[in-house]
Amino acid sequence: MASRGALRRCLSPGLPRLLHLSRGLA
């Protein structure tokens, strides 16, 4: 499941951004 770790690593920095976007949209 190396791809899973890579995805998590790529999403890690993007998660906060997504949260901010969702908060602004909500």
Swiss-Prot record:
Pfam family, one: PRKCH_uORF2
Listed transmembrane segments: none
Superkingdom in the source lineage: Eukaryota
InterPro entries the record matches: PRKCH_uORF2
Keyword set, alphabetical order: Protein kinase inhibitor, Stress response, Translation regulation
Tagged with keyword Magnesium: no
One GO term (biological process): negative regulation of protein serine/threonine kinase activity
GO molecular function, one term: translation regulator activity
Subunit (UniProt): Interacts with protein kinase C eta as well as other protein kinases including PRKCD, PRKCQ and PRKCE but not with PRKCG or PRKCZ; the interactions lead to inhibition of kinase activity.
Its biological purpose: Product of an upstream open reading frame (ORF) of PRKCH which regulates translation of the downstream protein kinase C eta (PKC-eta) ORF. Functions as a repressive element that maintains low basal levels of PKC-eta in growing cells but enhances its expression during stress conditions induced by amino acid starvation in a EIF2AK4/GCN2-dependent manner. In addition to its role in regulating PKC-eta translation, also inhibits the kinase activity of PKC-eta as well as other protein kinases including PRKCD, PRKCQ and PRKCE but not PRKCA, PRKCG or PRKCZ.
Comment field (misc): Suppresses proliferation and migration of cancer cells.
Protein name: PRKCH upstream open reading frame 2
Gene that this polypeptide is encoded by: PRKCH
